[in-house]
């Protein structure tokens, strides 16, 4: 629901890809406050529109680069990295790979290493020659993957990485929009999860509005 400006930017971007496939790179950045539907926009929007498999990587809790590029197979208990794992799970070479909380990488101990790998992934002149440390002698062609990143604070994103991306902005919701989202999307989802019927879980509009407008509860959040 909502995000019409962001949806328009996505349609323009896809239109450019159709008319001139080489005009844009293979990386997109979505900037916006928490809770504004960035993940849903990618998973339920871009991924389904393009008919591609969707994969999610949370960067906020990533400790070091080995999570992405794996460990050498000579080490006991070593494994391949998350990127190659996604290719195995999706069984294709062109999935949509969504990296959440890019701005949190700068807070991790080895943030620069992670940024280096992400920069390589989004470099169209290099990402057809990706190497995982576990499969050191095998080259993976990631040039057909679509890499999408989300972040809240642009000042914490590497300028080099940021400049490689087609940037899409999402805005927060007004109170009336939050009410519609709560009634038409959130409550039905909650009822389904707990196996309640429509008449077994009823929250009146005035109660929802009070929750939305109560700063002590929502902390003036722009999302839901």
Question: What feature does the model see in each segment?
Answer:
Residues 23-58, 88-89, 119:
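Walker A/P-loop
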Residues 90-95, 131-150, 203:
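AAA+/SF3 P-loop NTPase mechanochemical coupling elements
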Residues 32, 70, 101:
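The Walker A (P-loop) glycine that initiates the GxxxxGKT/S ATP-binding motif of P-loop NTPases
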Residues 101-140:
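Conserved catalytic/switch belt of AAA+ P-loop NTPases
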Residues 100-102, 123, 144-154:
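A short beta-strand-to-loop transition that corresponds to the Sensor-1 phosphate-sensing loop
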Residues 91, 153-163, 167-223:
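Conserved C-terminal "switch" segment of AAA+ ATPases
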Residues 48-78, 86, 106, 177:
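AAA+/P-loop NTPase substrate/partner-engagement loops
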Residues 1-31, 83:
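Pre-Walker A (pre-P-loop) alpha-helix and adjacent loop at the N terminus of AAA/AAA+ ATPase modules
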């Amino acid at each position: 629901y909502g995000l019409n400006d962001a949806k328009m930017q996505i349609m323009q971007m896809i239109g450019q890809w159709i008319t001139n496939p080489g005009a844009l790179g293979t990386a997109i950045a979505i900037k916006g406050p928490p809770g504004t539907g960035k993940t849903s926009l990618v998973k339920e929007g871009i991924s389904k529109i393009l008919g591609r498999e969707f994969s999610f990587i949370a960067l906020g809790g990533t400790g070091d680069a080995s999570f992405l590029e794996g460990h050498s197979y000579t080490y006991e208990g070593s494994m391949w990295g998350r990127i190659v794992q996604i290719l195995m799970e999706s069984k294709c070479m062109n999935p949509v790979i969504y990296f959440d909380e890019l701005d949190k990488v700068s807070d991790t101990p080895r943030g620069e290493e992670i940024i280096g790998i992400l920069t390589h992934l989004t470099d169209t002149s290099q990402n057809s020659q990706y190497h995982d440390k576990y499969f050191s002698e095998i080259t993976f062609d990631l040039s057909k993957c679509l890499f999408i990143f989300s972040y809240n604070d642009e000042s914490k994103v590497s300028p080099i990485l940021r400049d490689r991306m087609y940037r899409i902005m999402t805005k927060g919701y007004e109170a009336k929009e939050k009410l519609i989202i709560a009634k038409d999307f959130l409550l039905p989802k909650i009822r389904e999860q707990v196996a309640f019927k429509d008449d077994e879980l009823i929250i009146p509009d005035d109660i929802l509005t009070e929750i939305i407008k109560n700063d002590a509860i929502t902390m003036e959040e722009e999302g839901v």
